Each structure stands twice: as C-alpha cells, then as structure tokens.
Amino acid sequence: MKSLGRHLVAEFYECDREVLDNVQLIEQEMKQAAYESGATIVTSTFHRFLPYGVSGVVVISESHLTIHTWPEYGYAAIDLFTCGEDVDPWKAFEHLKKALKAKRVHVVEHERGRYDEIGIPEDSPHKAAV
C-alpha cells in the first residue's frame, strides 16, 4: 500500500552510556544518519540535560529524526519519520544502531498517510497541487 511516509519507532537497549550522554556526538551521528538515509537536513537542535541525557531533533525536508537518551539505563528512544520515495529510514536506523553500540533493538514501522485512508488514487504523484 502506498503512503505519504514511513515512520520507524525504535527502542535501543544496552547502548554505550558515554555515547548516549555526549550531546555533540549524538548530534553528529543523527545528522550522519539523516545524510545516509538520503534526506536533506533543514536544521537541528540538541540539548544535554543535567545530570545526564540528551534530546534532539534533526528537521529534514522529508520530515524529522528525533532522539531521547537515558544514559543511566543505556537506553535511547528514536523516531525516524521520512516522506518521499528517495529517503530510506532503515539506513538511518542501521547507522544509529552501530553508532550508539546498541546490543538489542525493537523497531516498529508505521505507514503514515496511507493513500487508501486519505482517498488518494494509487497512481497519483507524491506531491499534488494545492
């Protein structure tokens, strides 16, 4: 079924705790993940919490990538939402799995904006005139 976008909701477990608490490294790896997925980066913002933890977003022309880390638990919650045919959120997922050194992951893929639910014809172009 065609959809406007794909949304990966990922749980990363047993990650490197030092990586999870390094805001500069997290931002660098999230941007690299966006690049590897084929996305176009618009902007990003990241914040390190005290005493630990990082939250951040990479806004891409095709939607967004977000991360929230809990270094004390070795855990990261990651959303990779991409639109369009040219961006592959699974490439971003694989990059981040390696970068965060996750030993276990759980991921669910959601189709966002399914054509049949919205009433878009299957042969319709991805972007329609407004």
UniProtKB/Swiss-Prot annotation:
GO biological process, alphabetically ordered: spermidine biosynthetic process
Site, as annotated: Cleavage (non-hydrolytic): 62-63
InterPro entries hit by this protein: AdoMetDC_C, AdoMetDC_fam_prok, AdoMetDC_N, S-AdoMet_deCO2ase_core, S-AdoMet_deCOase_pro-enz
GO cellular component: cytosol
Modified residues (Pyruvic acid (Ser)): 63
Name of the protein in its database record: S-adenosylmethionine decarboxylase proenzyme
Function: Catalyzes the decarboxylation of S-adenosylmethionine to S-adenosylmethioninamine (dcAdoMet), the propylamine donor required for the synthesis of the polyamines spermine and spermidine from the diamine putrescine.
EC id: 4.1.1.50
Residues forming the catalytic site: 63, 68, 83
Keyword S-adenosyl-L-methionine attached: yes
Description of how the protein assembles with itself and partners: Heterotetramer of two alpha and two beta chains arranged as a dimer of alpha/beta heterodimers.
Pathway: Amine and polyamine biosynthesis; S-adenosylmethioninamine biosynthesis; S-adenosylmethioninamine from S-adenosyl-L-methionine: step 1/1
Record has Disulfide bond as a keyword: no
Catalytic activity entry: S-adenosyl-L-methionine + H(+) = S-adenosyl 3-(methylsulfanyl)propylamine + CO2
Family according to the record: Belongs to the prokaryotic AdoMetDC family. Type 1 subfamily.
Keywords: Autocatalytic cleavage, Decarboxylase, Lyase, Polyamine biosynthesis, Pyruvate, S-adenosyl-L-methionine, Schiff base, Spermidine biosynthesis, Zymogen
Free-text comment on the cofactor: Binds 1 pyruvoyl group covalently per subunit.
Gene Ontology MF terms: adenosylmethionine decarboxylase activity
Cofactor: pyruvate
Leader sequence segment: none
Free-text description of this protein's post-translational modifications in UniProt: Is synthesized initially as an inactive proenzyme. Formation of the active enzyme involves a self-maturation process in which the active site pyruvoyl group is generated from an internal serine residue via an autocatalytic post-translational modification. Two non-identical subunits are generated from the proenzyme in this reaction, and the pyruvate is formed at the N-terminus of the alpha chain, which is derived from the carboxyl end of the proenzyme.
